[in-house]
UniProtKB/Swiss-Prot annotation:
Keyword entries, A-Z: Endonuclease, Hydrolase, Nuclease, RNA-binding, tRNA processing
Family statement drawn from the similarity comment of this UniProt entry: Belongs to the RnpA family.
PANTHER family xref list: RIBONUCLEASE P PROTEIN COMPONENT
Name of this protein: Ribonuclease P protein component
Organism of origin: Prochlorococcus marinus (strain NATL2A)
Function text: RNaseP catalyzes the removal of the 5'-leader sequence from pre-tRNA to produce the mature 5'-terminus. It can also cleave other RNA substrates such as 4.5S RNA. The protein component plays an auxiliary but essential role in vivo by binding to the 5'-leader sequence and broadening the substrate specificity of the ribozyme.
GO molecular function: 3'-tRNA processing endoribonuclease activity; ribonuclease P activity; tRNA binding
Self-association and partners: Consists of a catalytic RNA component (M1 or rnpB) and a protein subunit.
Length: 128
């Protein structure tokens, strides 16, 4: 399952902004970077008119697995999990979240990875 369009984080400027300004939360198999999108410099043209206040992206490196099938399976797993967890969330401001999986994540089963993801989202204050 793919993240709904209104929940996707797109554009290299968004990712650059998250890397420079975002807060980092670490676990043994992933890193969560979170930032408040209202702090970003306004880009001329389009204003953000999203009905959803949380946008996400997931990065899975070739170091995690050389097989694209495995990486895509992990990506789909996380997209499905995030769309279920964050679909009914409402925040006052727009939040951008970026999850990077570490190469050590392949040692863990899927359920453990999803629990770690939930812990990081709670630690970041996105979910309760």
């Amino acid at each position: 399952m793919v993240l709904p369009k209104h929940m996707r984080l797109k554009g290299h400027r968004c990712f650059d902004f998250i890397y420079k300004e975002g807060s980092r939360f670490y676990s043994s198999s992933m890193v969560l970077r979170v930032t408040d999108a209202n702090k970003k410099p306004q880009v001329k043209g389009k204003q953000s008119k999203t009905r959803h206040s949380i946008k996400c992206a997931i990065s899975i490196s070739n170091k995690v697995s050389k097989k694209s099938v495995t990486r895509n399976k992990l990506r789909r797993l996380f997209h499905h999990h995030l769309s279920l967890r964050l679909s009914n969330m409402a925040c006052d401001n727009e939040i951008w979240a970026f999850i990077s999986l570490k190469p050590s994540c392949m040692k863990n089963p899927d359920s453990t990875l999803l629990k770690e993801c939930d812990k990081l989202l709670t630690k970041a204050g996105i979910t309760k």
